[in-house]
Amino acid sequence: MRTIRVATIALGALVHVAGAQSIQYRSPSGVEYRSMADTGAVARARAALDADPRNVDRVIALGVAQSGVRQFREAIETFTRGIAIAPDNAMLYRWRGHRYLSVRELDRALADLSRGFALDSLNYGVLYHLGIVRFARGEFDAAADAFRRAQPRAPEVGELTGSTDWLWMSLSRAGRHAEAKAMLDRRPDSVKVANAYAQRLRLYRGEIGPDEVITAADTADVQKATLAFGVGNWYVVRGDTARARTYFEASIRSGGWPGFGFILSEVELRRLR
């Protein structure tokens, strides 16, 4: 009996290892993008949840830990488990919707984030990710509405910079250029922060040129994907789809496949066909 029990435990460990390297997304061209191995955070979060399996905070903690190593499909299963426990918890829909976005299941992402909005219309994470999904669907006015609602509810300056960036992009793509400029002129992101969105906002304001957005210091895959998409979108707004395509393709080459810039670059390249 002890031998069987040990073998079962070992098999469970192997399943977790295999899951840690599982295929998360296969692109239309057949490129497979995989998750990474757990470095301990997932195991600790799983153990904490096992000790209190109906604790929704621990469910979310496990899903967030899985997301940290790009185990997005596993995280979706975790959040689904949480929704079975607490079907009216807005944060579970916020997180599962985000992860559906990560694996390019946009309809499911929209359904979850819309449900999250119905439960808590003031939640920044719900609003922000709902805006991303609307943008991906080409619903730019609706995206602008979501980011406008999110902007004053940003929990910290980095998030404020992000929602300001996406609001400018959404307004611009909706053809509402005067509103986009007026919003930037109010400088809602006046507190300085060093992130990709801050670099992109400098481009939108004319403080730097498109060739200056991506620097030698930008080596992380998601960072490069984010910056390249921003420049590509800026060219779309200016009507230069040839240069836009170049930057969208660069975003894909970055390898930062979980990033919104990568996801939206895929979308934009399909639109440009």
Language model features: what each stretch is:
Residues 20-57, 61, 68-69, 273:
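N-terminal leader/linker segments that initiate helical-solenoid repeat arrays
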Residues 47-48, 81-82, 115-116, 149-150, ...:
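Canonical positions in the second alpha-helix
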Residues 51, 85, 119, 153-156, ...:
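Structural marker of alpha-solenoid helical repeat scaffolds
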Residues 56-57, 90-91, 124-125, 158-161, ...:
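Helix-start (N-cap) detector for alpha-helical repeat units in TPR-like alpha-solenoids
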Residues 68-69, 102-103, 136-137, 173, ...:
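Register position in tetratricopeptide repeats
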